[in-house]
Curated annotation (Swiss-Prot):
Residues of the signal peptide: none
Keywords associated with the record: Cell inner membrane, Cell membrane, Membrane, Transmembrane, Transmembrane helix
Name of the protein: Putative NAD(P)-binding protein YbjT
Organism of this sequence: Escherichia coli (strain K12)
GO-annotated cellular components: plasma membrane
Gene: ybjT
Membrane topology qualifier: Single-pass membrane protein
One Pfam family of this chain: DUF2867
Subcellular location: Cell inner membrane
Residue stretches spanning the membrane: 440-460
InterPro entries reported for this sequence: ComplexI_NDUFA9_subunit (IPR051207), DUF2867 (IPR021295), NAD(P)-bd_dom (IPR016040), NAD(P)-bd_dom_sf (IPR036291)
Length: 476
């Protein structure tokens, strides 16, 4: 029977997949997250998208009205700082809202737990979140899982990037720790099927795949499936020595997320899924098969609204490119109108060229010409750009009037990138955000990005400020 469901953390990796699955089954979904634009563009049936910041959830009680089930998929691993405190505060806010507006049940996707004296910050945060949610006087089903094998799973992408980017793998000793990796498809089935088995009291289930594998065995299986042969030599390196800088040059996964995950891999994390399989039987997918389907799924990454479903971007994508995009940008507040900002942004490549640091843009173009890469020059005469237009070596791939203009990177570099100009009306003011997104091709692509970061931050800051200044002059 269709339910009215609130998904908290709907824009995340699991959230996006879960919302699609629930939509296909005819449930009425309220998808809530801080950033829901990408999900909204999918225009899924029976799905309404709502911006919610659970650090200040003023609108959460209203969203809880008439809700049957809440999925809690929120975590703060990628936020940096004291994410334990952040996760506790989010859980407290949700608990308080549920006390005010109760629902029939809450399903919380958590992590497998190590013994208390062996827990990492990530595992402690997950446990604290569960304990707080259980104080809401609502039946809580906590579903604990270890490594999830699926496109976009941070743990999987760290492993993938290490195999693709390093000629020799020298992981710390935790590589011998064992776990029970589960395919994304199996995990989603459990999450959805729990709707048909509502809880009347708190309960905890553990989800597992069909195999117990050490991380070393997972690396070996991945190399066999992908055809990437690498030496794997574990070394006695404490995980606390793994720096953010090191992670920045071996994986496209956000380094704070990657480090938090790795800190939790020091001990065996084995699931006992006996109770869950008795309640919800299904065929569990073998690790190798899950890896094959995941690598196939990753080929579709660029065929998305972020890239305007552009055929050229899709053709340029390579399996070795990092799944997660590195990004750098700058946001400016302005009194200028959206119309004025949009008009200025559309002048890119014209009289104002790139608004700031034009000598640096020219230098970058000369570097391409020096290696024999010919770049187009010029832009259309019309005032407003259209999808498919060329702006020098860039290609316009997304045009959302008074909201977003996205250009496909056309210069020579190890990876695939785009440059986005995003506008937003905040009521008393507007914002202009200038931001580059980069999917690196192996370690050369990661080093290229790190070398360009200082210039990017300097240029994008200047571009955003100059666009705002020109728009304010036009508005006045």
């Amino acid at each position: 029977m269709p339910q009215r469901i609130l998904v908290l953390g709907a824009s995340g990796y699991i959230g996006q997949h879960l919302v699609r699955t629930l939509s296909q089954q005819g449930h009425q979904i309220l998808a809530a997250a801080r950033h829901v634009d990408r999900l909204a563009k999918l225009q899924l049936a029976n799905v309404s998208c709502h911006k919610v910041d659970l650090s200040w959830p003023d609108n959460l009680p209203a969203l809880l009205q008439d809700i049957d089930t809440v999925y809690f998929l929120v975590h703060s691993m990628g936020e940096g700082g004291d994410f334990i405190a952040q996760e506790r505060q989010v859980a407290l806010n949700v608990r308080d809202a549920l006390r005010e507006v109760p629902v029939k049940q809450l399903i919380f996707l958590s992590s497998l737990q190590a013994p208390p004296h062996e827990q990492s910050d990530h595992l402690r945060a997950r446990q604290a979140t569960a304990d707080i949610l259980r104080e809401a006087n609502v039946p809580v089903t906590e579903l604990r899982a270890g490594i999830i094998v699926g496109a976009g799973s941070a743990a999987f992408e760290v492993m993938r990037d290490m195999v693709y980017n390093l000629p020799v793998l020298t992981p710390p000793r935790w590589v011998r720790s064992r776990t029970t990796p589960i395919a994304l498809e199996n995990l989603l089935h459990y999450l959805v099927a729990l709707l048909d088995h509502p809880a009347s009291e708190h309960r905890i289930f553990e989800a597992a795949g069909p195999e117990v594998l050490s991380y070393q065995q997972q690396f070996e299986h991945f190399m066999a499936v992908s055809g990437k042969r690498r030496w794997l030599i574990p070394i006695p390196l404490p995980t606390r020595w793994i720096s953010v800088w090191f992670l920045n040059v071996i994986t496209s996964v956000p380094p704070t997320t990657a480090r938090a995950l790795i800190q939790g891999l020091k001990h065996d994390l084995l699931a006992d899924d006996t109770a869950l399989r008795a309640l919800i039987p299904q065929r569990l997918i073998a690790f190798d098969d899950a890896v094959r389907s995941t690598l196939k799924e990753e080929e579709k990454l660029v065929n998305s609204s972020d890239w305007g479903y552009d055929a050229q971007a899709f053709a340029r994508w390579r399996p070795e490119y990092g799944y997660f995009a590195k990004q750098a940008g700058f946001t400016v507040k302005t009194s200028a109108s959206l119309a004025a900002l949009w008009q200025v942004v559309n002048q890119i490549g014209g009289k104002e060229r790139y608004f700031f640091g034009n000598i640096l843009w020219q230098t970058r173009a000369l570097m391409d010409r020096a290696i024999g890469h010919k770049l187009a020059k010029g832009r259309p005469e019309r005032e407003y750009l259209q999808t498919g237009d060329a702006v020098d070596s860039w290609k316009v791939i997304v045009v959302e009037p008074e909201k977003q203009l996205t250009l496909l990177f056309g210069m020579k570099a190890p990876g695939l990138g785009r440059l986005c100009f995003s506008l937003e009306d905040k009521g008393d003011y507007r914002t202009i955000d200038v931001r580059a997104f980069w999917h690196p091709h192996g370690m050369p692509g990661l080093f290229y990005w790190l070398l360009m970061i200082p210039a990017h931050l300097f240029i994008f800051r200047g571009m955003a400020k100059q666009i705002a200044r020109l728009a304010e002059q036009s508005t006045d």
